[in-house]
Amino acid sequence: MKTIKRISVLVLVSLITNFTWAQTTTDNRSLYEAFEMSVSDGLNLQATAKVGIRPVYGLFSVGTQFVAENYKWAFGAGVGTHLIRNENHSMNLEYMIFHVNENEIWTDNYNNFQQIRLLYSKRIGEKLSIFGGPSLNLNIAENKQSYGHTFESTFDPYSFYSHVGNNHTAKGWIGFTLGIRFDKK
């Protein structure tokens, strides 16, 4: 648990530093800004804003899992990098961490969704690209008695990895993401 909190703080600090540096730089050619809409098995509909410099950028995202039985939504942040980037193609590696809310506007219990995505994109217009790729997903949720009830997350669509501990449940799965991206060349 302490390791996850440390990683979360590290990601947030790097995002803030990256965003601040990207806004103060005088060379706007290195500034990267994008907005994308995507669908996946974890968050069925997701909107993401990206800002940073060309090699590294920050991500801010909100999404929902509307095909599930219960109401679920999440918000999060992350960091990404361009592994390959040219005029018509790019390959990005991204790490996202979300707080998941289930069956209510705000879930007080620790309910964390982490995602690593490898995305290939193809430019189809001057400011429009389509993208897709595999993702590794992990949902870690508090399963102990707290806030007057016992919480058990139902966020994962399926799992190939599952671990139940004294305080937390972890479920992992491999997924896929498809979407459209609005950005400049």
Regions found by a protein language model. Give the residues of each.
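Short glycine/proline- and aromatic-enriched beta-strand/turn motifs that initiate or cap beta-hairpins
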Residues: 22-70, 181-185
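Extracytoplasmic loops and strand-loop junctions of Gram-negative outer membrane beta-barrel proteins
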Residues: 31, 101-103, 157-164
